[in-house]
Amino acid sequence: MKKLLSTFVMVYIAATAFAQTVSFTSPNAESQKMLDSVKYVLPEFSAGMVIFNNGEQSNGALNINTIDQKLHFIDPSGKILVLSNNDQVARAFIKGRSFINSRYGYIEIYETSGEIFMGEVRKVGFISEDKQGAFGSKSQTTSIQTISSIQAGNGYMIDFEKQKNSPYTYKKTPYLCRKGIVQPVTKKVFIKCFPDKKEAIEKYISENDPNLNNVQEVREMFRAISK
């Protein structure tokens, strides 16, 4: 049964919200321009579909925020909203791209082999020696958030006006998944995913010395091993 996304319980968030890791420790005009370009996974909100754990589906103009790792969408009035029941989302398809919801965030699927898939999570995080001072005091749970702030996963409120010139990191992290179990990429995890190809995995690593934190190198290894 399909429903409009606007029929679900939602909360307002900022339209201008915000792991290989790129760090910007001295904010400047260029780093802030970069931040604007990576605060969402896709460059623009696009037609997509959400599939929930119970099998229900919803359609709308969607995108994925790289700070809160939640689906955002545009309602009929043009407001940017965040889906409050993101924990009930199983998958999302946006502009021909496929995403799996996991405890690590939304994983964009790049490679598949039967029940195994490989993908990446993109995340933006602020750098601070004192998170309490940078993010402010812990917030109370609320059904509606102000248009200038958003609650980070650590329970702190981020005020965009105060944080827009803060140092930050932009991180792309590869993941592997088998039988619904998602894990960061390691040699051991590769072998768990392809137990019958242990020798091939060890040989590939010995000959190519891939950086298992690099999305493209993991993708190439996945293709080679899954042949």
Predicted region positions:
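Bacterial Sec-dependent N-terminal signal peptides
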Residues: 1-25, 221
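Residues in well-ordered beta-strands of folded domains
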Residues: 7, 51, 177
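Exposed beta-strand and adjacent loop surfaces of beta-rich binding modules
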Residues: 16, 47, 70
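Sec-dependent signal peptide cleavage junction
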Residues: 19-41
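A short, Trp-centered hydrophobic/proline-enriched beta-strand micro-motif
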Residues: 41-51
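Short coil-to-beta-strand transition motifs
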Residues: 51-58
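Aromatic-patch recognition
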Residues: 58-182
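A short, solvent-exposed beta-edge/loop patch
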Residues: 156-213, 217-220, 227
